[in-house]
Amino acid sequence: MPDMGTPLLTIQGMASPGELLNLSLNAKAILPEGFVLLALIGTLLVDLAGEEISKRWSPPICYAGLGSALIILGFGWNQSPESAFLGAFIADNFSIAFRAVVALSTLISLLISWRYAEQSGSPVGEYAAILLAATLGAMLLCGSTDLISIFISLETLSVASYLLAGYLKRDARSSEAALKYLLVGSAAAAVFLYGASLLYGLSGSTSLESIGIALQTSPTPLAALALVFILATVAFKIAAVPFHQWTPDVYEGSPTPVVAFLSVGSKAAGFALAVRILVGCFNAFDDQWKLLFTVLAVLSMTLGNVVALAQTSMKRMLAYSSIGQAGFVMIGLVCGTEEGYAAMILYMAAYLFMNLGAFACIILFSLRTGSDRIADYAGLYQKDPLITLGLSLCLLSLGGIPPMLGFFGKIYLFFAGWSDGQYLLVIVGLVTSVVSIYYYISVIKMMVVKEPQEASELVKAYPLIQWNSIGMPTLRFALLTCVFATAIGGVLSNPLFKWANSAVAGTPLLQEALTLAAEKGAIG
C-alpha cells in the first residue's frame, strides 16, 4: 500500500482501480467535517418537509452538527497529526485551531441569523444549508495539503458564499453584491488554476510538500510567476489591498449575518491557506513572498483604516476595518517566527469574538430600525443600553484599547514583529491603530454623547424590545457571549496565549519552517 503522504496523482498513476478501492482514506481525520455534512443534509431534509418544520428543526440540527465538530476538534488537540484522502488533508494543531475558528464563527453567525431570516421572510433551511456548505469548504481548506483538495475546498467555500451574498432575492443590493462577488471570485479562481498548473508542470506533483522540495532544488522564473498568481488568490480571499475592491460593496449589499461569517470564517480559511501554501510550498522564495506580503500589509493597514474614516454606513465602515485588520494579521505571517505564527492564530481567535459581537449589535439595531447608517445611531444609549454597551466594547477591542481582548492580540503581533526586525510593519500598525481608534470612538460618541433632543429620528421612534420573539433569545445569547469574551478575555488571556503557542508547537510544517529559518540564519 502506498504511503499516506504520497502525492495523490502519483498514487492514481501507479495503482490499478482495484488497488485504489483498498486504500485507506482515514476518514477519522475529517470526522468534524463529517458532522457538518450530516447537519447540512439534515437541514435540507427538514426543509423538504415544509417551512414550519424547517423553522423548528433546522436550528437544533445545526447546533448539534457544529457542536459535535467542535468537541471532536477539541479531542484531537495535541494528538499526532493524521493524514486523510491519500495525503491531501492533514489534521494537525494548526488546522484544528483554524477549523475551530471557522466552526465557531458559523455557530455564532447562525445564532444571530434566525431572527433576521424570520423578519426578512427568507427560507431558514436553505440559508442554513448554504452556510454549512461554506463552512465545510472553509474547514477543509484549513487542512488541505494538495492543489486538488485546495481548489475543491476553495470553490466549495466560494460558490456557497456567492449564494449567501445574493440570498435576499428581492433586494437589488444583495443581487448586485452576489454578481460582483461572483465575477471577481471567478477571476481569482482562474488565476489560482493557472498558478497551480505551473506548479504541477514544474514539479510533476500536486502535493505541496513535493512541490516545495522541487522548487528548492531548482527554483525557476516560472515558479516566481506561479507565486504571484497564488499570492493574488490568497490576497483576494483575505481582502488585502489591492485585491479588496469587492469587499465594501459585497459587505454593504449582503445580508448582515452573511457579512459576519465572511468577515471571520472566510478570512480565517484564507489565512490558513496562506500559511499552508506559502510556508509549505514556497520556501525557496521565502524572501520574495515576505517582501510582497509586507507591501500588502502596509497598503491594507493604511488604506483600510484611512478610508474607513469617511464611511457613513456601519457595514461599509466595518468592511474597510476588516481590510485593515487583515493587514495586522499579516504581520505575524511575515515574521515567520514561532511568536509570529502564534500571534496570528491568537488574533484570529480574538477577532472572531469582537467582530461577531459588533455585527450582532448591528443586526439587532437594523431589525428595529431598518438602517445601518452611522448617523442613525445618535442618542442610542437612551433607548437601548445593551446595544450601546456591547457595540462600544467590541469597537474599543477592535481599536486595541486595553484591557480588551483585541489589545492583547495586537500587542502580541507588534511584539513578534519588533522582535523579528519588522520595524516598518510595527510602526505602520501602531499609527493606523490610532487612526482606527478615531473612527471607532466617533461611533461610540454618536451613541453616548448626544443629548436627547439630538437623537436621530429612528432612535426617537425606537420600538420596544420583544425578547420572546422568534430568534431573539439566541441573538441575545450570542451578543452577550461575544461581548463577555471580548471584555473579559483580555484579562484572562493567558490560556489563549498557551493555546496559540501549542498550535504552532504541534504543527510539523511550522516546526520544519522554523528549523530551516534558524539554519539559514546561522549560515548567514
UniProtKB/Swiss-Prot annotation:
Belongs to the complex I subunit 2 family. The chain crosses the membrane at residues 29-49, 57-77, 94-114, 124-141, 146-168, 182-202, 223-243, 255-275, 291-311, 317-337, 345-365, 389-409, 424-444, 477-497. It is a multi-pass membrane protein. NDH-1 can be composed of about 15 different subunits; different subcomplexes with different compositions have been identified which probably have different functions. Keywords: Membrane, NAD, NADP, Plastoquinone, Quinone, Thylakoid, Translocase, Transmembrane, Transmembrane helix, Transport. InterPro entries: NADH-Q_OxRdtase_suN/2, ND/Mrp_TM. It is found in: Cellular thylakoid membrane. GO terms for cellular component: plasma membrane-derived thylakoid membrane. NDH-1 shuttles electrons from an unknown electron donor, via FMN and iron-sulfur (Fe-S) centers, to quinones in the respiratory and/or the photosynthetic chain. The immediate electron acceptor for the enzyme in this species is believed to be plastoquinone. Couples the redox reaction to proton translocation, and thus conserves the redox energy in a proton gradient. Cyanobacterial NDH-1 also plays a role in inorganic carbon-concentration. PANTHER family: NADH DEHYDROGENASE. It catalyses: a plastoquinone + NADH + (n+1) H(+)(in) = a plastoquinol + NAD(+) + n H(+)(out); a plastoquinone + NADPH + (n+1) H(+)(in) = a plastoquinol + NADP(+) + n H(+)(out). HAMAP family: NDH1_NuoN_1 (MF_00445). GO terms for molecular function: NADH dehydrogenase (ubiquinone) activity; quinone binding. This is NAD(P)H-quinone oxidoreductase subunit 2. Its EC number is 7.1.1.-. GO terms for biological process: ATP synthesis coupled electron transport; photosynthesis, light reaction. Pfam families: Proton_antipo_M. Disulfide bonds: none annotated. It is an enzyme of class 7 (translocase).
